[in-house]
Structures are given as C-alpha cells and as structure tokens.
Regions:
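N-terminal secretory signal peptides and thylakoid transit peptides that target proteins
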Residues: 2-23
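N-terminal "arm"/small-domain region of PLP-dependent enzymes with the aminotransferase-like
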Residues: 19-78, 93, 161, 168-169
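Phosphate-binding glycine-rich loop
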Residues: 76, 86-125, 143
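PLP-dependent aminotransferase-like
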Residues: 118-175, 196
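Conserved PLP-binding catalytic core of the aspartate aminotransferase-like
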Residues: 152-154, 294, 303-337, 360, ...
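Active-site pre-lysine segment of PLP-dependent enzymes
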Residues: 160-168, 181-204, 208-238, 254
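PLP-dependent aminotransferase class I/II
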Residues: 228-305, 309-312
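PLP-dependent enzyme catalytic core of the Aspartate aminotransferase-like
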Residues: 333-337, 345-402
C-alpha cells in the first residue's frame, strides 16, 4: 500500500525534517556505527591481541577486491561516478531489481540513520527489539521520536505482534535479521505479518547486514513488490570491507527519495566501489565464507556446550554467551587476557557478544574464557581505570583496552 501523501502531509513532514536537521546541527549530529558502539577510543590494540568485539571479518576483503583497490588507487584524483553506476547495476542484476531501487552509501549506517530521520518524528515512534542494534535509536532521538524497545520472543526472534501493540503511532519498525547481537532470525512470514498490520504511513526498516551468514530469506522480494520496506545491505560483514565502507539502501524510488533528502547525492569512494563490484562478481566468495564462519562458530559453541556454558544459538558471525556475572566485569577480565570481546546490552546484564574470529583466535578465546570463568583470572574481574566505562546516549561501552 503506498504511503499516504497529500499537500498537508508534505508540508508537515518538511517542517519536521527541517526541525530534525536543525536539532542535529545543534547537538553535533553523528552517525553512530558499530565501531563507535564497540569502541570508545582509537588507540592500537596490544600486540597479539584477539579482537572479536565489533563483528568484523578477520578474513578482510577477498583477493579480487584487494586487486581492485590497488588498481584503482592511482585514479583516486577522479570522482569516477560512472563506477558507482556499474556497482549498482551489478548488484541490481544479481538481485533482480531495477537500478533505481538501489541507492549506494559508504556502508549501511548512513541509510539506517537517514531512514529513521525521514520516517520518524515527535509524532512517529521508532520501534526496535531489545536487545537489538542501537544505532537507529540514536537517530530517533535526533528526530525527537519516542524509542520503543520490545523484548525478543522465547526463540529470540522479533516479537512482531508485541511491536505492533506497543506503538500504534510507529513511523519505523526496525528489524535486524539475523539480529545484532543475538545472531537469531525473524522469519519472513513474521516480517510479512508486520508489514500487513503496521500503521498506515509507517515503514519497515529491515537490516540485512548479516543475512549472508544465515539460512534465511531476504526481504528484497518485498521491495520488488513495492511494499513500504527499506532493506539495508553492507559489504562490512561477509565481504570483509568494514574499513573500506560500502553498502546500499534498497527500496522503491518514492522511499529512497525521502531518504536522499537527508543524504544528498555524493560521490562514493572509488576504491570501495571497485572492491565491492569485484566482490559481487566472485561467485565463490559468499558460500565459502559462510561455510568457514559456520564451521568455526559451531566448533566454538560445541566447546561452550561441552563445558556447561550457556549461549544463544546463532546464524550469524556473532553469538551471545552468559558470563554469570556483570558483563562489563567479564569484558575487563577478558581484556586483561588480551582478548577483546563485545559490549554489553543493559537488558541482559550478564551476557556478552562474541564475534566469530579465525579458528586460532577462537581457541585463544576458549582458553581465556575458561580461565576467567574458573576463577584463575579473578584478579582481573575488577575494572581498572584503563578498563573503565563511558556512557553514550545510555549505551555502555569500553573506554580503553590498552
């Protein structure tokens, strides 16, 4: 069903958008990203550190992507916007989409934030899972929207019926599937149910950052059907391009135009575009990396189960484990072992998120985790000044790991 649109709605929306933009300028608007949430400082890690805290891919860009970056670096003095058109066409052809349904960005954080700014307001709430990825809530605060957090179901899926009941005034329903931080899925049928029963004028913002790791159906088919859906994709996860920055907002043109009102139409970094295009053309990349990630994740979870540790089964490149103590203490204790794990979520105060690293990295994680859990590293459980915690919009994140 098309979004309701009349001159009065346009006028009011324009006013709210201008208000949001003014508020953003006043408070120093920042796009919150996974590295910002995972880390509060930019100092180098200690030597030989195991870094499994920000859902990065330790494999990095694939070979053809690295070659593409090298080949393109000497042309960095040109905008070369035609390359972005080629990237969009390559992706659109693979997905069976029309090119004007795809808008490229440096990663998926920007379209996430801009979508929230475009479709929420003081009268239009932002609805998300708890625990869930926090960045959209930050954008909702900029727009003056009410942030509604709804607990996951017993199977750790988004509780779409509870989300509907919690916010009849919703502007955006944010669905991250697989979910960050749990790595669990929300079924396509549940997403369709939410779409069929949502308030008129609202959208579903479906974040598929981790979809390539999972056995799951994409919501791109709903975009093809011209539904009120914006799908987010990124090259930061399975493609290993977190530092290069490339992603897409995918929606029917009317919705993308509203998102673009906040972003403009800027040139993309050509090295990222070249690497992304080359990666899409490598047919073996996704299935091979999915297999590697699943094998290492399964082996790690089998070890946790064998040793009596509680965790949440995942279909992503991360999972959550119960530390049986305050999460921030566990994070500090693991950091003292030179193993850096993910941040806590207030709703589950004893759970920590673990990114799936390489097999040697996960073996070192197991050694450090067992030492801490057995009490062998008890002296590390009290956070030192270097492991103290900051608070960013109510989000607890580590201040230092040196």
């Amino acid at each position: 069903m098309p979004l309701e649109e009349n001159p009065a709605c346009r006028s009011r929306r324009s006013f709210l958008q201008l208000s949001a933009a003014a508020a953003a300028a006043t408070v120093g608007f920042r796009i919150v990203t996974e590295p910002m949430l995972a880390r509060a400082d930019s100092r180098p890690f200690p030597k030989d550190a195991v870094v499994i805290d920000a859902n990065e891919n330790p494999l990095g860009p694939c070979g053809v992507a690295c070659s593409a970056v090298t080949d393109m670096a000497s042309q960095g003095g040109r905008y070369s916007m035609w390359m972005t058109d080629d990237l969009v066409k390559t992706f659109s052809d693979l997905q069976g989409l029309k090119p004007h349904y795809v808008l490229p960005f440096p990663g998926s954080s920007e379209p996430l934030h801009y979508s929230v700014l475009a479709f929420t307001s003081p009268a239009k709430s932002y609805v998300t899972a708890d625990p869930g990825y926090e960045a959209g809530a930050h954008a909702a605060k900029i727009s003056g929207a009410r942030v509604v957090r709804v607990p996951l179901t017993k199977t750790y899926a988004h509780d779409v019926k509870a989300m509907l009941a919690a916010a009849p005034d919703a502007g955006v329903f944010y669905i991250c599937s697989p979910n960050n931080p749990t790595g669990t899925l929300t079924s396509h049928s549940d997403i369709e149910y939410l779409l069929d029963h949502k308030p008129k004028g609202s959208i579903l913002l479906v974040d598929e950052a981790y979809i390539h790791f999972a056995d799951a159906s994409s919501a791109v088919d709903l975009v093809k059907a011209d539904k009120d859906v914006v799908v987010l994709r990124t090259f930061s996860k399975i493609y290993g391009m977190a530092g290069l920055r490339c992603g897409f907002g995918i929606a029917r043109p009317e919705l993308l135009e509203k998102v673009a009102e906040f972003s403009g139409w800027n040139a993309m970094p050509i090295t990222a575009v070249a690497a992304a295009t080359a990666s899409l053309k490598d047919e073996r990349l996704v299935p091979e990396r999915k297999r590697i990630n699943a094998t290492i994740r399964q082996a790690t979870c089998e070890w946790l189960s064998k040793n009596g540790y509680s965790f949440i089964p995942s279909q992503s490149n991360c999972f959550m484990v119960d530390a049986k103590r305050p999460a921030k203490e566990m994070i500090a204790a693991m950091a003292a072992q030179n193993v850096f794990i993910g941040r806590p979520w207030p709703v589950w105060p004893t759970y920590v998120r673990i990114t799936v690293g390489t097999q040697p990295e996960m073996e070192r994680f197991q050694e450090a985790f067992q030492r801490v859990m057995s009490g062998a590293a008890t002296a590390s459980l009290t956070p030192t000044p270097e492991a103290s915690f900051l608070n960013l919009d109510g989000l607890v994140i580590p201040a230092s790991r040196a």
